[in-house]
């Protein structure tokens, strides 16, 4: 299975992050998303040391409130923490809505980068999503879009997007779009997101269930 299953780790303290990371690894995660914005006092945490201590593939994310995150500091502080994480994380995720200069600073420092777009209100048209993805890939290695469907047809737009674009993570959120987190693997998505009971986005399924369902659906080599 080429699609990596990523489990987000969203905790208030560094020890809790380390503990949850261990449980996610034991549960079968291929990669972890460390949500810096979940930390109560991220400025007091040595982000580099935290990621190195975990010793497992990591996506470092410091999600802005505009796109569903919880970071309460300034934008400058948010970017500085991402820059610190970029030195040791396998991937760094930065939002397309960030200032272009900040995106270029972060992606330029990262080993590999994800430029992401989140829309919790609706699913833009396929044409609009294609423009978003191509813009994201001009600056990052992987584009990520996560959008909210109003009907089943909206969920199909997300899968259709994956037929046009490689190096793209595309997610239809919520209960309606839950199946796309599994189906995306059939369309070549490099990463899909699962949880350990407490998801960080609507529609995330348990990591074990996600792996089994992808295994059942993927054709034999």
From Swiss-Prot:
It catalyses: 3-dehydroquinate = 3-dehydroshikimate + H2O. One of its GO terms (biological process) is chorismate biosynthetic process. 3-dehydroquinate binds at residues 33-35, 63, 181, 200, 204. CDD domains: DHQase_I (cd00502). Signal peptide: none annotated. It is an enzyme of class 4 (lyase). Its EC number is 4.2.1.10. Pfam families: DHquinase_I. InterPro entries: Aldolase_TIM, DHquinase_I, Type-I_3-dehydroquinase. Pathway: Metabolic intermediate biosynthesis; chorismate biosynthesis; chorismate from D-erythrose 4-phosphate and phosphoenolpyruvate: step 3/7. The active site is at residues 118, 144. Keywords: Amino-acid biosynthesis, Aromatic amino acid biosynthesis, Lyase, Schiff base. Belongs to the type-I 3-dehydroquinase family. Homodimer. Involved in the third step of the chorismate pathway, which leads to the biosynthesis of aromatic amino acids. Catalyzes the cis-dehydration of 3-dehydroquinate (DHQ) and introduces the first double bond of the aromatic ring to yield 3-dehydroshikimate. This is 3-dehydroquinate dehydratase. It comes from Methanothermobacter thermautotrophicus (strain ATCC 29096 / DSM 1053 / JCM 10044 / NBRC 100330 / Delta H) (Methanobacterium thermoautotrophicum).
